[in-house]
Amino acid sequence: MAKLQAAGAQIYVCAKNAAGGLNWTFREPVAALLEEGKTVGRHFVGPTWEFVDGSRVEGEVVTKAPGKTAKDIPWLKLSVKESPKSGLVAGATSILRIDTKGGVFEGACDNEGELHSEPYAATYVFVK
């Protein structure tokens, strides 16, 4: 149906854990969605994909598989909560996140509330 490249960042926040210490916690993705080098939408918290044609989908994670390396975020299969009636991904029932590169961050977390942006890239496949 649609196979799009994503280029962006995984955003982490330095937050208290259950033991009272600080650690980096995933907050949200922020990415441009590209088709043949042209920006056709954006990906953000939800997870949500919004397109320049006005259509929008939200997904829910069904399954995960490890990325190719420890630095790569997992590959995902997501179900579409409600498929748009028109637009680039009209009729989509599921979304695959594959070919991930980067996005995993680990490091010292000293200032509660501090944000860190970790670059990532992925391919999103929207399936009918």
Regions found by a protein language model. Give the residues of each.
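Primary mode marks residue(s) on the alpha4-beta5-alpha5 output face of response regulator receiver
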Residues: 1-12, 18-128
